[in-house]
Amino acid sequence: MTCKTTYRLAAIITAGMLMLTGCSSDNDPISFTGYAMGTVVSETLYTDSDDISTDIERAIASVENTYLSRKIDKSEISKINSKASLSPVEMTDTLSEYMDTLLEVSRDSGGAFDPSVGALSALWDFDNDSEIIPSEDDISKCLSYGSYKDIQLSGSSISLPPGLKLDLGAAGKGIALDTAESILSSDKNVSGAVISVGESSILTYGRKPDGSDWQIAIRDPRDKESTIGTLILSGTSYIGTSGDYQKYFEKNGRRYHHILDPSTGYPAESGVISVTVICNSGIICDALSTACFVLGADEGMKLAEKYGAEAIFVKDDQSIVMTKGAEKLWQSAS
């Protein structure tokens, strides 16, 4: 029988991938729920003005519409995908910075994160809930187009070989949270905030008025009603999770999920079912969570530590391993 996850979010994420707990009753926040990047955006703000909420939601939507969407013709990624194999395409400074950062993660991860998987993403079509397993020939054809190594950058211009397409979606929500953080940091009326984009990406910003820590509960990847533990965080942090339960279907007893291994063209099989990364950059956090999932616990842990990030891995047998720094932030649910 085919199974799918569904996206649900109540006030401050009660049924999502990551959940905020422990808000102060003495200094109640203002909460908003909106929609952008094809998912729910939740804002919990400690402020005496709610004007900033609309600015954040619009900025998050603009990240996709202006830069990242593969479906909006006017977005930069769409223009690159349609023209960069014919002649170099000039990028804005913003997208150029994104590409520089993501290609660095690609190199450091040995291609476990690869922003050039657009053809594979379109083939599997998880965004439209496709449950069709592509043929080996079609997957091989996509792989033949090349990889991140074949992306040619010259200053702020980019060229791609024929067939190769960009897809920055694996880092998109993290990029959106970086944008949200820049807005929050420019508003002195905001002392603290938690912003989530979808179920998988969260920003904790500043502090609550009472000085207490942020508490982010991590969902059990095999039981959406349960948690495996809680992260205790102070100040500003980004939390990104990649899991095989977020978008998937099952056929013949096998789970086909949306986190593709760029080296095989198939859903990654690395011995883990969920990876949560904590670091100080949204774009790097999301890229690392994908790369660490593809690499598996041992190599993924090395990659996270290279970036000064912390990571929590849930293995196939549901055992949990994590970086030493994560141990200091972690409270087990059991």
What are these regions (language model features)?
Residues 2-334:
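Mature catalytic core of soluble alpha/beta enzymes
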